[in-house]
Amino acid sequence: MANLKDIKLKIKSVSNTEKTTKAMKLVSNVKLKKAKDFAKQSKAYAIKINELLSEISAKIQVNIKSFADDKFFDTNREVKIVDIIFVTADKGLCGGFNIHTIKKVKETIEEYKSKKIKVRLRAIGKKGIEYFNFQGVELLKKYIGLSSSPSSKKAAEVIYEAINDFENGKTDKIVLIHNGYKNMISQEMKVNVLLPVEPPTANENSYVGSNMEFEPSDGGDNIIRTLTKKYFEYSMYYSLIDSLAAEHSARMNAMENATNNAKERLSQLNLEYNKARQSSITTELIEIISGAESMK
């Protein structure tokens, strides 16, 4: 049985760990609430832009050559190269958050490679960058600091770098992958095709399938550019905020589990300490009694 001094050192170490994980859980909880509120505010706007753009893009399919930006909506474009933008955290200690994202990225890479399609990676987040660097996988772009501190300006820069390559024929498709917030105890992996824009199927309840008429004019191209610009910006920015909320949720749960494990370990160590102390006292009493008996 371990001696009392060793057990006391273990108790102190585990106790300090418990305090640290408990504090990290509280910090993550506060950050999660802020990220959730921010994401909620941005999501409604992003969804409305997406819906409007998709409705118009469906109408454009009928007369796609009328628009200067028709390549954004050309879903029949031959795909030879795909750019994958993926978001991981800059920090660890968040359970399987980063692992799940990396796994989905690898699966997506293999899916395209099986179709003889070249894949280029644009990595956001230190953990994803470190992993693929270690694996010897080439990364076209690397962004550190953006996933932990989302910026709409920086998000726009990231997405427009990819869009420029799309317009210049360097890539034929842009896919965005991130681990999003679902609820307090789970996350949801999201894989979205940003380009080309996928229009919905027209039906009697949609603007496209009913009375919506979209006639090209001198300002038509500007309308499309403005909508697509906002759509891409907010899709990128929202994915960063959504990922951050999911990260804080995962870290909060990981720290809660770590705290519970530390408490359980402390209970075991205290029991072990009490047993060792009792054994030590018993041994001392036996020695005293034996000594007294020998003196008779």
Curated annotation (Swiss-Prot):
Membrane topology designation: Peripheral membrane protein
Superkingdom: Bacteria
GO-annotated cellular components: plasma membrane; proton-transporting ATP synthase complex
Keyword entries, A-Z: ATP synthesis, Cell inner membrane, Cell membrane, CF(1), Hydrogen ion transport, Ion transport, Membrane, Transport
Signal peptide, first to last residue: none
Major localization listed first in the record, in broad terms: membrane
CDD domains: F1-ATPase_gamma
Subcellular location: Cell inner membrane
Subunit description: F-type ATPases have 2 components, CF(1) - the catalytic core - and CF(0) - the membrane proton channel. CF(1) has five subunits: alpha(3), beta(3), gamma(1), delta(1), epsilon(1). CF(0) has three main subunits: a, b and c.
Name of the protein this chain belongs to: ATP synthase gamma chain
Annotated organism of origin: Campylobacter hominis (strain ATCC BAA-381 / DSM 21671 / CCUG 45161 / LMG 19568 / NCTC 13146 / CH001A)
